[in-house]
Regions:
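A glycine-rich, Thr/Ser-enriched phosphate-binding loop motif common to dinucleotide/cofactor-binding enzymes
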Residues: 43-48, 67-95, 117
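Residues forming the Rossmann-fold NAD(P)(H) cofactor-binding site
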Residues: 122
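Residue-level "contact hotspot" at macromolecular interaction interfaces
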Residues: 11-13, 74-80, 104-105
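Adenosine-nucleotide cofactor-binding segment
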Residues: 108-110, 114-117, 125, 129-207
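Short helix-loop-beta connector
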Residues: 71, 93-111, 190
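Glycine-rich beta-strand-centered segment in the early N-terminal region that forms part
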Residues: 1-28, 46, 58, 65-67
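Helix-to-beta-strand junctions that scaffold the AdoMet/dcAdoMet cofactor pocket
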Residues: 212
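Short, Lys/Arg- and Gly-enriched loop/turn segments at beta-strand edges
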Residues: 26-36
Length: 212
C-alpha cells in the first residue's frame, strides 16, 4: 500500500493505493544494468523490507502498476505465475534442415513436468490444464514425494484433465527402477515434445534430456 507520494507522481498515485511492481525493468541504467530488480538491486527497496522507497527507475519505466484486486495475496502471485506462463510461451521446436524456431508448446503433443508438484509445479499444472488456445494430449507429472503427488492429484484430478482433452498421469519416479525407461514407455516410445524441469537437480535434468 502506498503511504506517501512525491510531487512528481501525485497526479498518478495517491496514499492508500494498492500496487504491484513489475520487477523485470530491462533498464540499462540500473545499478546492475539490465538485470537490476527491485528487492535485490536497490538500496531502499529490499525484498524483506516493511517500508520501501520506490526507485526512480521503476517509475520512469512505468513498472509501478495499480492493483485493484481484493487483497495482497493474489497480487503476490503475479510474478511466479508470469514465470510459469513465460516458460510455456518460451518453448520452441525446430525441424532438421531449418533454422526456424516454432514457438510455443505443440498442440496435441506430449509434455512431461519433472519434479512438478511443488508450488511452481502446481501453478504449471493449473495453467496447462486451463489453457484455451493449445494443450498437450498427454501430460505426465513426476516427483519422488508420494504425499505431494497425492495432493496434486486431488487438486488437479485426472477426471478434470480428461474433460479438457488431456491424459494426465502422476508418476513417482522414486519407486521405479529405471525412470527414463518408464517415462518413455508412457509416451509410447516416442519421448516428449516438451520437458519442463522444476528442480535444479542434476539427475532430474539428465532425465529430462533423456526423454525428449
Amino acid at each position: 500500500e502506498i503511504k506517501e507520494v512525491g510531487s512528481k507522481w501525485k497526479d498518478q498515485f495517491k496514499p492508500g493505493d494498492k500496487f504491484s511492481i513489475q520487477p523485470a525493468l530491462n533498464y540499462e541504467g540500473g545499478p546492475a544494468g539490465l538485470l537490476s530488480a527491485p528487492g535485490y538491486s536497490y538500496r531502499y527497496a529490499g525484498g524483506d523490507a516493511t517500508y520501501i522507497i520506490i526507485p526512480s527507475d521503476v517509475m520512469e519505466m512505468g513498472c509501478l502498476l495499480h492493483y485493484n484486486g481484493p487483497g495482497f495475496y493474489p497480487a503476490s502471485l503475479s510474478e511466479p505465475l508470469a514465470c510459469v506462463i513465460g516458460a510455456m510461451h518460451a518453448c520452441y521446436h525446430t525441424h532438421p534442415g531449418s533454422y526456424v524456431h516454432q514457438m510455443e508448446i505443440k498442440d496435441g503433443g506430449k509434455m512431461a513436468l519433472l519434479a512438478g508438484v511443488g508450488p511452481m509445479g502446481l501453478a504449471m499444472i493449473n495453467y496447462v490444464l486451463r489453457r484455451e488456445d493449445r494443450k498437450p494430449s498427454l501430460f505426465v507429472v513426476t516427483d519422488i514425494d508420494q504425499a505431494r503427488l497425492d495432493r496434486a492429484a486431488t487438486l488437479y484430478t485426472k477426471e478434470f484433465a480428461a474433460s479438457r482433452g488431456i491424459d494426465l498421469r502422476y508418476v513417482n519416479t522414486g519407486t521405479v527402477e529405471n525412470p527414463v525407461e518408464t517415462l518413455r514407455e508412457i509416451s509410447g516410445g516416442t519421448g516428449y515434445d516438451e520437458v519442463i524441469v522444476m528442480a535444479p537437480v542434476p539427475a532430474v535434468v539428465e532425465q529430462g534430456d533423456d526423454i525428449l
